[in-house]
Amino acid sequence: MIVIDGKKVSLELKNELRERVEALNAKCGKVPGLTVIIVGEDPASQVYVRNKAKSCKEIGMNSTVIELPADTTQEHLLKIINDLNNDDTVHGILVQQPMPKQIDEFTITLAIDPAKDVDGFHPENLGRLVMGHLDKCFVSCTPYGILELLGRYNIETKGKHCVVVGRSNIVGKPMANLMLQKLKESNCTVTICHSATPNITEFTKQADILIAAIGKANFITADMVKAGAVVIDVGINRVDDASAKNGYRLVGDVEYAGVSALASAITPVPGGVGPMTIAMLLKNTVQSFQRVNGL
């Protein structure tokens, strides 16, 4: 059984990106820039934003964080986004979710220039993904990271049955569309399951590649997986654990101990898919810079 090490792959990718940024700087005299906007003081969001800024610095990219109070109006946020859309030094714009209730997330997503939407959430980028124009869009970072893992571990995907459990706009839907593409890392027959799917085990047991992104701790158990399947666990859930220092531990959507005994390859939680998300955000931002500069 292979443990798919996302932490290791993300470090390899960051090293590659650092070398690419150095080469771009030598050629163009400038580097990619990412601006992250955070509205309010959600503790988890603040941690994510700090990690993104740290990762940018590690590969030599410019990084700016705009911190706004929780009572920021939608109009004010839209003005900031418009200014960033017109700033040639900014190649990626990300508004950290969740946002306060007075701000409509879809309106904000629409306001970001699709050419700078390195999160891959804009409908134009999603539409290009569906149509197979991957060279002209940005793919949502978590699905993109999973594709990178499959490729780097040489997982055979062509013609395989991929079952995606979860239908979110951030992971499930783009993941299913990505696995349909005629790529070395995908080209699958795809089934998507969700909370209203009856007898879900009938579908998951057919999966050669099972991607769990449903947001429920230990939802996928050994009796739901066929022997030899490749299992990708997107979930990250807190469960109470009195023996842990913080009183909780992190688990995925897959019951790791049981499923890993059956799987041919599996991602752990933590250390699997999670580290890849920021790495792919960096990759998208570098790609944005290259497109703008015709490279």
Swiss-Prot record:
Pathway(s) it belongs to: One-carbon metabolism; tetrahydrofolate interconversion
The alphabetical list of record keywords is:
Amino-acid biosynthesis, Histidine biosynthesis, Hydrolase, Methionine biosynthesis, Multifunctional enzyme, NADP, One-carbon metabolism, Oxidoreductase, Purine biosynthesis
Instruction: Quote the EC number.
Output: 1.5.1.5, 3.5.4.9
Q: Which InterPro entries match?
A: Aminoacid_DH-like_N_sf, NAD(P)-bd_dom_sf, THF_DH/CycHdrlase, THF_DH/CycHdrlase_cat_dom, THF_DH/CycHdrlase_CS, THF_DH/CycHdrlase_NAD-bd_dom
Q: Which NCBIfam families match?
A: PRK14174.1, PRK14186.1
Q: What does this protein do?
A: Catalyzes the oxidation of 5,10-methylenetetrahydrofolate to 5,10-methenyltetrahydrofolate and then the hydrolysis of 5,10-methenyltetrahydrofolate to 10-formyltetrahydrofolate.
Which family is this protein grouped under? Belongs to the tetrahydrofolate dehydrogenase/cyclohydrolase family.
In Swiss-Prot or TrEMBL terms, this protein is called Bifunctional protein FolD
Query: Gene name on record?
Result: folD
